[in-house]
Amino acid sequence: MDKYDKNVPSDYDGLFQKAADANGVSYDLLRKVAWTESRFVPTAKSKTGPLGMMQFTKATAKALGLRVTDGPDDDRLNPELAINAAAKQLAGLVGKFDGDELKAALAYNQGEGRLGNPQLEAYSKGDFASISEEGRNYMRNLLDVAKSPMAGQLETFGGITPKGKGIPAEVGLAGIGHKQKVTQELPESTSFDVKGIEQEATAKPFAKDFWETHGETLDEYNSRSTFFGFKNAAEAELSNSVAGMAFRAGRLDNGFDVFKDTITPTRWNSHIWTPEELEKIRTEVKNPAYINVVTGGSPENLDDLIKLANENFENDSRAAEAGLGAKLSAGIIGAGVDPLSYVPMVGVTGKGFKLINKALVVGAESAALNVASEGLRTSVAGGDADYAGAALGGFVFGAGMSAISDAVAAGLKRSKPEAEFDNEFIGPMMRLEARETARNANSADLSRMNTENMKFEGEHNGVPYEDLPTERGAVVLHDGSVLSASNPINPKTLKEFSEVDPEKAARGIKLAGFTEIGLKTLGSDDADIRRVAIDLVRSPTGMQSGASGKFGATASDIHERLHGTDQRTYNDLYKAMSDAMKDPEFSTGGAKMSREETRYTIYRRAALAIERPELQKALTPSERIVMDIIKRHFDTKRELMENPAIFGNTKAVSIFPESRHKGTYVPHVYDRHAKALMIQRYGAEGLQEGIARSWMNSYVSRPEVKARVDEMLKELHGVKEVTPEMVEKYAMDKAYGISHSDQFTNSSIIEENIEGLVGIENNSFLEARNLFDSDLSITMPDGQQFSVNDLRDFDMFRIMPAYDRRVNGDIAIMGSTGKTTKELKDEILALKAKAEGDGKKTGEVHALMDTVKILTGRARRNQDTVWETSLRAINDLGFFAKNAYMGAQNITEIAGMIVTGNVRALGHGIPILRDTLYKSKPVSAKELKELHASLFGKEVDQLIRPKRADIVQRLREATDTGPAVANIVGTLKYSTQELAARSPWTKLLNGTTNYLLDAARQGMLGDVISATLTGKTTRWEKEGFLRGASVTPEQMAGIKSLIKEHMVRGEDGKFTVKDKQAFSMDPRAMDLWRLADKVADEAMLRPHKVSLQDSHAFGALGKMVMQFKSFTIKSLNSKFLRTFYDGYKNNRAIDAALSIITSMGLAGGFYAMAAHVKAYALPKEKRKEYLERALDPTMIAHAALSRSSQLGAPLAMVDLVGGVLGFESSKMARSTILPKDTVKERDPNKPYTSREVMGAMGSNLLEQMPSAGFVANVGATLMNAAGVVNSPNKATEQDFMTGLMNSTKELVPNDPLTQQLVLKIYEANGVNLRERRK
């Protein structure tokens, strides 16, 4: 397009509109500036250096926050980023020049430095001749879109108005019959009615106006020295200082009273001025800014005060004409005479504070005190405070005093050469001078450094920095700015301080062993314990500052993220395996093999195809999908081990051992039974030799195997040639670990038990890697064919979870701490030794040890005995019978979502609804769901469960249980486990949990992505919320950059992530994950998180006692106190209040609805009476308070005790207790017996412990059944049948349908459910 036409669309009009709206600049101006600069070509490059559509220089681009690489990833080549930056720059210039868009455009084109600044000054004077021809043409080209008071003058400058378009001959000779048209061009030739442009009145020449104002010419003014007016400036500083005012007032007759009046603040003056006095003050005080000299005084001194005020004004007016050097010198004098300059601000404390260097203590103190003095001076002498000048003067004064002391030090050094005297002030002073010059001259800040070759390896709270080698403690930031060591925002200083004294958790409720690991460790009084814990966990109460802990990824964060994505992978694999098993090879004809054998066969084919890629062509399409999922999973784990820094910690290094077969690795786990059979046949030494021979066969026959083994052995032995003996020894050593130990068998990877932390750093999966191939067969002594693969276990539903449990821990620890598991273990063991003899600290260190066990997939307790396994089976049955209402009850947890308005994504499971809700958004609901799945995976899942053989094997190997008992108890536990896991009510519980958490996170993702793409901000970017999530503003900006860089617009106008794997592996994605995790925490309590685990690992009996109560205990800190702390620490009091009110409404509403549903479990005749009791307003209020997710935890704890003591209101609020008939009132005059009290309390206790109650009801069922069989008459039989019905109801799910079914069965068998007549 050779000529600009605003009616011709471009591909970037949407970006222009979005950037213009976001930055408050004219769309037409921004668009035409882009056309003028580059003709809308994103890759345009000027010969002089500017690049991209908006033609940014390197310096300008960096100043605007763009990445400059001169490569294809240079942000100047990104139209969206460049246009937004240009809009931001134009908006700033327009505001700076009071809305003059032409002047802003000139500054954009010519800059504001050495070349541009004179042109801008000429523009202000109307001297267009002094503006370059390029600048004038640039402005003229924008006259039709730029608003400016100088537009008319520019248009007439240089002659007549610019010419119109040439007139074709056929138009010129067309005559008056030619059809005219309305255009934006000049009038056509068929009309001669040309009107000129009305011009403004002739302006007074600037030189004349300047002479009249200043009494000197421009040349005289410009030739002034920088120290011009020093005398006037110094007099003003001295006269108007506090000391000067005191001296001048003292010369008056009533001097003390006058000075007292000048220093008295207006608000403290009790005198009420009369109308006459007020009028006198208004008319006689020359400048209103100096009126405070008078208004603090008394009427007796009014004339003297007015005189002082006017003298102060005249002094300051003369000083205002002085040059910069004169003002600075006068400021130094002012600082010198001010008493506050000599206040020892830091004093003794600062001398021992290692983070503060001497020079900036002196300079910064003087600057700060001089600013305070400036405020005091203007309150006494009147006028406008010049805080910048005061700070500069004070700084230089402090520096000067420091220089004097340095001169003394230099003299001392000559006499004592061994002494060290450093002057560290020169660097900060030079930067200060450069910044002040840039500010005053509107030029580039020369104190900023070139950052192109800097690595920025340091980081604190999301702010990367590079050490400045020439100045101790100083750092360079990404934008090139340098921060001194004592700068309060220096990230290195802040990091060192946090390491010296890590922040402590906010006060919480500690309940011995039930105290959360996060609170116990981060709430420690020992700074060393907190220093370790801050990288591992988060406190449920948050920290004392209101943050949730580390402003970066903790080990628990990484562990939970990996666990979620692993669960998604397992579900994908399960579905792919189900599809593969439907292949005709397995699904047609006679039954060739069981489902288990079919699954194992497919797994084996997929694993071998990964290890030998040439086998992939033999796979069916469905088997290929299975293989791809497995391969992608192990490849991703390898990438994470190689680069754990993707979680945001630049100190994290690779923990992956060198491997010569990347991309073809599947963990080698050996089947215990297959190995035992081989040892029985060949002996351990025979099996070792067979394994080694099989491996040697691959070494001899496959060049790639030989090459990688030789390479490794050369490095290992430091030789140039590898001998056959070296290879054979390596093969035999590796084979010994398989044939002579259980280290790498399938039983050893199910769950490891270790004492303390001994050996916790050992990772058998990484140690088991070898460089041979295991698929080649050899002939054994008995003539049988054997390959190492014959010993392997290929069941991926056993191998993958075990591999992930172990590897995820090492990744999480390195990714958060920058340390290996061994280094962390050694640090914790040192803390343990230090805490010896202190029970409280020892308990906190043990909590740290347990945290590491959880992260690395180790058991915190010894293996369950037969007794404990039986108790866990009973717990399963109690859960099966009492969890019907819990899935629906999850809805009462979402008060936080409702209050923040984060409800749009609640329809994400209904395609039509979700698409409708996101129809107007730049990203579709389907894309959000896929992005969420790639980043967060699946939160709660029970797909991976121990098999019956695993449980039996564990009992036999880890306890002294015989085979028969192990089989019985193992089968029982497996059966109850499957019963509880497959229950529809369990699936509803897990399903609603995942659905609501996904909705909360997807809603936040949608908001942030939409706001980023449209240039807006969201509720999630508020300071209080970000602090509560431990996300810095810089990290939030990084999240936005991540979104912009990875999202592209499709043909349908919707944005999508072009590579979700790359998106999720970007370090900034971890900050996005943490932000969404905070949203999920506010949506629902998640007791399965690492930080919320009990600090003591309770056994099966403890779990039985606390079944269904752990949620209430965790709510005390995570919901009740955290809501309170968020309210007042993070300025979210309104959110906290609304969430409490909303949660009470949800709890009360759910209780009322649940009461109606529960009533259906009763006989029809008894429902009305039950509902009258349950729906009593007092009961509803009690339930609303006690079951509120935000406020209810304390009262719910009281209800736990109240239920045991028999209070009906405490029982009715619990969903695990079935509705009962009306209890007959006890005669109040009848004495109590111990049997009666213990019997009632025992019954109540069993109701509060569902698992124990289940056992009691099994016993009652058996005894009632025996009573029915042996009853002597019909009436007795009916009584036993009624008892049998009541005990049976407690053994089945507590949903109303099942309960009603039980009632109908017994009613059909003769049980009379109606009340007997009295």
Swiss-Prot record:
Record's keyword annotation contains Amino-acid biosynthesis:
no
Q: Where is this region: Essential for viral DNA translocation?
A: 1314-1318
Q: Which GO MF term does the entry hold, naming one?
A: hydrolase activity
* Gene3D superfamilies noted in UniProt: 1.10.530.10
Tell me how this protein sits in the membrane: Single-pass membrane protein
Spans within the Cytoplasmic topological domain:
1158-1318
One GO cellular component, as annotated: host cell plasma membrane
Where is it predominantly found? virion
Q: Which InterPro entries match?
A: Gp16, Lysozyme-like_dom_sf, Transglyc_AS, Transglycosylase_SLT_dom_1
Locate the region Transglycosylase SLT-type domain: 24-111
Its quaternary organisation is: Homotetramer. Interacts with gp15; after ejection the gp15-gp16 complex composed of a gp15 octamer and a gp16 tetramer probably binds both the viral DNA and the host inner membrane.
What name has this protein been given in UniProt? Peptidoglycan transglycosylase gp16
Instruction: Give the originating organism.
Output: Escherichia phage T7
